[in-house]
């Protein structure tokens, strides 16, 4: 079943301009968090344009939502049923960032970023989740301004929906990101539960067992304690459990080495407790194939440093017009009690869940006759590889400095073009491809 989208009505007018500006601001903020190479001083995202070509949507399956969408926040800030009621919320927007121990820091602003206070918008937040306590390192800086897409969508995007953009009402954005842990092939969380794809709610994170089972396995595992995968995969060692006859604990502490007890205690304190929402019969999830090949455009300006006659002698502006986006992937849209969860599946996970589809094979690389640098995959087999990207092709048109006699002063900008294209692809895959997913309150 295909879905028709009135692309012009959805992306034009004041609402379309606001949405385009918020997307531009979001991508710009992500570029500010990237470590730039030595030959680039700065990167600025100037504009974003939806273009005139609409994507194609085809519903592939309707099933129960993934179990991951039922998980509540560890820090207790998850909105309850009463908090997502129809009562208007304060106009200020909050921004919070959780820590591995569940602590959160927040900062509030008195306006919604565009100068006008929206008294009907709910609090938007940015959050990262780290399953099984595998987090190590510093958190990235939070976004400068949370994106409230609910104000920008309009009913033309999904004509049959009763609300702007998605069913329900004014929506606001929450972001969840869960690292993949380097799994691929049959080790991916989705592949491990593909056998029960039609038997009930799925969890793309079933590769991590519940904390209770992990604690039991940690006590009985002697070989996998120091392995990075020991916290995320089941232990293969046997479980030895003694039954106490004098009313004591089932385990004899004398038989547990002191070093193992210390490690076990560390694992117990590091593993978060997954609190799940109650599943209801009216919860549902839609898997749809999304194809796009149009004239969407992203304009970026990069400052290139010249090292002659001395290091960092001068900076030249390089204008990059990124266009030629070609996208083909499977989108997941789950509706769970006034929440819309949206993400994309990696090509490998999509083939595991829906089966390999010859129609979804990668298209051949675009043959550009204007010497434009482009990025595309050339895999033409029916089953896509795990390293295939959902963004099949991206092209960039570069313009540096001033022009003389219709020719550019400098043309050797291949390194900058390659870097920018790689970052655009990485931002998309890290922010929209599972295990990352976006939550809209409706």
UniProtKB/Swiss-Prot annotation:
GO molecular function: lipid binding
Record's compositionally biased regions (Acidic residues): 69-80
Compartment(s): Mitochondrion outer membrane; Endoplasmic reticulum membrane
Keyword Protein biosynthesis listed: no
GO cellular component, one term: endoplasmic reticulum membrane
Biased composition (Polar residues): 90-100
Listed Basic and acidic residues bias regions: 213-222
SMP-LTD domain mapped to chain residues: 1-442
GO terms (BP aspect): mitochondrial genome maintenance; mitochondrion-endoplasmic reticulum membrane tethering; phospholipid transport; protein insertion into mitochondrial outer membrane
Pfam families cross-referenced by the UniProt entry: MMM1 (PF10296)
Keywords, ordered alphabetically: Endoplasmic reticulum, Lipid transport, Lipid-binding, Membrane, Mitochondrion, Mitochondrion outer membrane, Transport
Ranges that cross the membrane: none
Membrane topology: Peripheral membrane protein
Stretches the record annotates as Disordered: 67-125, 202-277, 364-387
Protein's UniProt keywords contain Zinc: no
PANTHER family: MITOCHONDRIAL DISTRIBUTION AND MORPHOLOGY PROTEIN 12 (PTHR28204:SF1)
Subunit architecture: Component of the ER-mitochondria encounter structure (ERMES) or MDM complex, composed of MMM1, MDM10, MDM12 and MDM34. A MMM1 homodimer associates with one molecule of MDM12 on each side in a pairwise head-to-tail manner, and the SMP-LTD domains of MMM1 and MDM12 generate a continuous hydrophobic tunnel for phospholipid trafficking.
Assigned protein family: Belongs to the MDM12 family.
UniProt free text on domains: The SMP-LTD domain is a barrel-like domain that can bind various types of glycerophospholipids in its interior and mediate their transfer between two adjacent bilayers.
Protein name: Mitochondrial distribution and morphology protein 12
Organism, as annotated: Arthroderma otae (strain ATCC MYA-4605 / CBS 113480)
